[in-house]
Amino acid sequence: MTDQELYDRAVAAAKRAYAPYSNYFVGAAVLTMDGHVIEGVNVENAAYPLGVCAETSALSRAVAEGYRPGDLEAIAITASPCGGCRQRLHEFRLGRVTYEHRGELVTRTADELLPDTWDFE
């Protein structure tokens, strides 16, 4: 699957996001090493800190389906990932992270997005 095809899946997922407060709908699509695509969306809450980003939603679904760090090949997101999500993407060792930035698709590695990540090593 190309990065563009994965991004198109994220765009389709974004239409299902729950964003009644900001009206900012975000979708994410994770490509697993065995070729499955797992989608996630942002889910807002009236108590703003309790909302969930699309990347977190997709990664949580992947974990619930039995995937672990190293099992995921790529992710596409309809927005630039926040700092917390960059840490999560690094944790799962995403080789390719594609997102829209200022109207263009950008592809980076998780290491490029967060070069000095925190970990236990």
Predicted regions and their residues:
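Compact, glycine-rich, soluble single-domain proteins
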Residues: 42-56
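A generic structural signal for short beta-strands and their flanking turns/coil linkers
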Residues: 24-26, 39, 71
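Short, charged low-complexity linear segments at domain edges
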Residues: 52-71
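Glycine/charged-rich beta-loop-alpha catalytic/anionic-binding loops adjacent to active sites
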Residues: 34-45, 67-68
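Short beta-strand scaffold segments in enzyme catalytic cores
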Residues: 22-32
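C-terminal binding/interaction regions
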Residues: 2-19, 37, 68-121
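Small-residue (primarily alanine) positions within well-ordered alpha-helices
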Residues: 10, 28-29, 58, 62
